[in-house]
Amino acid sequence: MTMALTQNLWQGRVDDGERGDTTRLFRIVHVLEAADVTPLDGAPVLLGFNCDAGVLRNQGRPGAAHGPDAIRQALANVPAHGLPALYDAGNVSCDDGDLESAQLALAGTVRDVLARGGLPLVLGGGHEVAWGTWQGLRAHLDAQDDGGRVLIINIDAHFDLRTSRPASSGTPFDQIANACAERGQPFDYVCLGVSRLSNTPALFSRADALGVCYVEDVDMQERHLESRLAELAARIDATDHLYLTIDLDALPAAVMPAVSAPAACGVPLTVVEEIAMLARHSGKLRVADLAEYNPQYDRDHQGARVAARLAWRLFG
């Protein structure tokens, strides 16, 4: 496991000859040094998780370890639109197959960003990122002696509730469920975009046994958007803290080809964007992550731009 900063990735177009505000994100990004303890006052902080060890363990296609830097490059040229600051905390890299150590390192960095008042946005990497992200949030809340409820909203074609071990990209929410049970805390998990053709009856049974609230992909289409947003708003109102995780394989393959398991149906990008904005403006979003972007299977950087667009919706 290694840590690396990414300042050289932030390059883009300069339009100083044009009138008005032409600032792009690469011009406002700041490298977040671990030794710096300056309060972040709610500023967004990017953190990469260069790992697809969990995808490999889950018999998927590798390549997501290269996702975070490709998403940064797509973000670099996005107009800032008045965003005062964006921070980059570098990458946690799992370069030796030791997934568990990488997840602990990720958790520590997420905890530290939260302690400074930042909003961590973790860029995966496989969806094994979720176990590290959640542990970081939980560690921060424990340090604050905060026993408030944590709602997890996962936009995903898969439950990721596999009970098999060792842990993989298919197990993070089962791991979280077990951790919540050990702590005597509720497991508040909403999974949106589940594909019945990509999850076995055993996984549906596991979700039912855990009391998971799930909505299948066919019921996440634009015609259902108003109802879905109202339901989510009610759930968010009833919680104290929100963790939003977006597995990019929830999107239709035509929109997001660059994942290990492209979706035949999927959730429309406009629907995912609306949910991201609902979370962002709720005042309860504590941490978010984007998982499974795999540049090896991208077309003309389409997937990177989609991931960057969703990232922007979460902090712009």
Curated annotation (Swiss-Prot):
As its record notes, the protein acts as a catalyst of:
N-formimidoyl-L-glutamate + H2O = formamide + L-glutamate
Q: Does the keyword Metal-binding apply?
A: yes
Pathway of action = Amino-acid degradation; L-histidine degradation into L-glutamate; L-glutamate from N-formimidoyl-L-glutamate (hydrolase route): step 1/1
| SUPFAM superfamilies per the UniProt record, alphabetical | Arginase/deacetylase
Residues the record lists as binding Mn(2+) 2 = D156, H158, D247, D249
Query: Pfam families this protein is in?
Result: Arginase
The highest taxon in the source lineage is Bacteria
Name the keywords, alphabetized: Histidine metabolism, Hydrolase, Manganese, Metal-binding
Top EC class, one word: hydrolase
Q: How is the cofactor bound?
A: Binds 2 manganese ions per subunit.
Q: Which GO terms describe its biological process?
A: L-histidine catabolic process to glutamate and formamide; L-histidine catabolic process to glutamate and formate; putrescine biosynthetic process from arginine, via agmatine
Residues recorded as binding Mn(2+) 1, renumbered to this chain, are: H127, D156, D160, D247
Query: Has keyword Hydrolase?
Result: yes
Cofactor annotation: Mn(2+)
GO molecular function terms here? Answer: agmatinase activity; formimidoylglutamase activity; manganese ion binding
Listed InterPro entries: HutG, Ureohydrolase, Ureohydrolase_dom_sf, Ureohydrolase_Mn_BS
Q: What is its EC number?
A: 3.5.3.8
Q: Which HAMAP family match?
A: Formimidoylglutam
Task: Report the PANTHER family cross-referenced here.
Answer: ARGINASE/AGMATINASE, FORMIMIDOYLGLUTAMASE
Report the function annotation for this chain: Catalyzes the conversion of N-formimidoyl-L-glutamate to L-glutamate and formamide.
Family per UniProt? Belongs to the arginase family.
Please report the name of this protein according to its UniProt entry: Formimidoylglutamase
Q: Which organism is it from?
A: Cupriavidus necator (strain ATCC 17699 / DSM 428 / KCTC 22496 / NCIMB 10442 / H16 / Stanier 337)
